[in-house]
């Protein structure tokens, strides 16, 4: 690398650091905002900041819900985000059931999910639950949509969507009848999601600096 190119890259890394320093400061401010009873604003901004980082990291994929779930599962810092809530998955697949390829298999899937234990499941457990009732192609079709039933997807639905398109998310979504590894499922609240935001900022900073490219790709498609 020439000296000019090296200097340009060094300047770029400094710019990346400055950008994420600013993002980190914004995230830190949200806690202060929350403490001063501007809780709706704190939750809305927290949801939007994660949305922005997810869109940037997952570019060029433009599926907001998928990207939001993906970044929480990969970088949210809690294994629970990848676990599946059977009722949530059933509700999500019900929205797809009018499509021709789902009309035949959804009733079978729904019956099995409705009688599942009131706990969060790992992906392989849901596969084992459904496998005896579907052929290989049908099972793969369903597996690709498992993300819609994850705990991360519940955060998207109950926190992000409520914040951006409603009147603000509730201050704590609880799961009184559902367990995770034998214990109560933690409530989805500002502090959980804010912790995710802080971790995601750190991860996306590292990806950008280590690759020398914004969010690992500089918003350029590989050739």
Regions found by a protein language model. Give the residues of each.
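Residues that form generic nucleotide/phosphate-binding pockets
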Residues: 22, 71-75, 203
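Generic structural signal for well-ordered, non-membrane alpha-helices
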Residues: 24-28, 48-51, 158-161, 165
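Polyanionic, low-complexity intrinsically disordered segments
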Residues: 2-18, 39, 100-223
